[in-house]
Amino acid sequence: GHAANEPPVLVDALVRNYEQYKDVEIVHWVPMGKGEYCDPKMKGHLRHNAMFVGGPTRKAVQEGRADYTPFFFQQSSRFFSDGTFPIDVAMVSVTPPDKHGYVSLGVSVGGTKPACLNAKMVIAQVNDQMPRTMGESFLHVSQLTCCVEASTPLPELGGGTIGEVEEAIGRNVASLVEDGSTLQLGIGTIPDAVLK
């Protein structure tokens, strides 16, 4: 699962049992948890391939213990649909099923649904704290290989500390923005500094 769709109970189980796995690649966008799958002791067992290098994974990428595949977010659906990233197991958080047996992927649909539709196996953390969203967010329970019920708060991305460099970049960029402009911002301290 991507961002707040990351299933913490499943990720914790994967990390806790890492010695059972050999050369497993974890393809992930925005990591929200601790990123323990990037710990040096995971070598030979779990290897992270980050599509967005965030706090928990940055050091591992810099030290060569994890990979970075740059991409545009709008490409994420295609990457999983066209086989660029073949998925053996998709791990996601979902809502409890409705009376018709449909679960919602909740707050992070993006490439998560194509990953589920193209994975050989889908393991879902059924989380009653995941909000049900409408649109293309639904899977039927028959599309899930395995479900684990666990009520956990959704992961949240905390704000980083804006340092002198980010402050200077933010001032520079902000000086280029005209009054009344519409801004589309990314994640991190530099976009935060631009808004400041």
Where are these regions (language model features)?
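Conserved alpha/beta enzyme-core scaffold
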Residues: 1-196
